[in-house]
Design a protein with these regions (language model features):
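Conserved P-loop
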Residues: 34-131
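Interdomain "pre-motor" coupling segment immediately N-terminal to P-loop NTPase/helicase cores
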Residues: 1-8
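Loop/turn-to-beta-strand initiation segments
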Residues: 113-116, 173-179
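Short beta-rich binding modules
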Residues: 7, 15, 39, 45, ...
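N-terminal pre-Walker A segment at the start of P-loop NTPase domains
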Residues: 9, 14-42
Length: 236
């Protein structure tokens, strides 16, 4: 409550009297409604899938690794991605960005026995997305899409988030989603340390951040270096 020790003279007598606090300060506070804390937190009972982002250079075995997933199906934007896989591997080759979203929605809505969905590669899928937005807005540059001022980049992020949301819903049904990407070297400027280079997904920084933040697991493929002679002899 505000202090009541301040005084002021009354108009009639000039005698100092305490200032009364406004009624709003003396009104009783409304009681806080009671609720059960345990109803806010629930344990997961249904089996859930994982969203995995796997990055690496071409021909390093990303697609081969995904063949070990349970009952996988491919959304194949990279047409050469399954060359080393059996012809019986189920796949669909999207022609447009919308085909990718429709395929994920169908996998979400329709009955099937697939337990993993592989997007191979998101690097090519993002190129499809930009082409789709340019055609939709009848522009020749992403900078001009939506009237410019960064709107095109915002539309890209919105569409990526739409696909991520579909994948997360598939995860809730116990279906794994695996996203493959090419990689590139990226220079990181640090305010404290010297600048350094790191391996990054070959896409725009903002969309790469969306994928990395949404993923349960982020993995990068590294070459396996075998040096049996040096290990056995101790010689360089």
């Amino acid at each position: 409550a505000p202090p009541t020790s301040f005084t002021r003279p009354t108009p009639a007598t000039g005698v100092l009297e305490p200032i009364r606090p406004p009624a709003a300060f003396t009104a009783a506070a409304s009681p806080v409604p009671a609720f059960d804390v345990e109803t806010l937190f629930k344990a997961s009972t249904a089996p859930e899938g994982w969203l995995i982002v796997l990055g690496g250079p071409p021909k390093y075995g990303k697609t081969t690794w995904c063949l070990g997933a349970p009952s996988p199906v491919w959304i194949l934007t990279d047409r050469g991605g399954l060359k080393s896989a059996p012809d019986s591997t189920p796949r669909m080759v999207p022609e447009t960005w919308e085909d990718i979203a429709r395929a994920l929605q169908a996998l979400l809505d329709k009955p099937h026995n697939y337990r993993a969905v592989v997007l191979d590669t998101v690097f090519k899928a993002e190129a499809m997305l930009i082409k789709y937005l340019l055609a939709k807005d009848k522009k020749d540059s992403l900078r001009k899409v939506g009237g410019g001022y960064g709107t095109g980049a915002e539309w890209v992020e919105g569409e990526i988030n739409r696909v991520v949301d579909l994948m997360l819903k598939l995860n809730e049904k116990g279906i794994h989603t695996i996203v493959l990407s090419q990689t590139t070297l990226q220079t990181v400027k640090d305010a404290v340390l010297d600048d350094y280079e790191k391996t990054a997904l070959a896409m725009s920084k903002k969309t790469a951040l969306i994928w990395a933040a949404a993923a349960d697991v982020n993995m990068y493929v590294q070459p396996e270096i075998k040096e049996p002679a040096r290990i056995e002899t101790g010689k360089e």
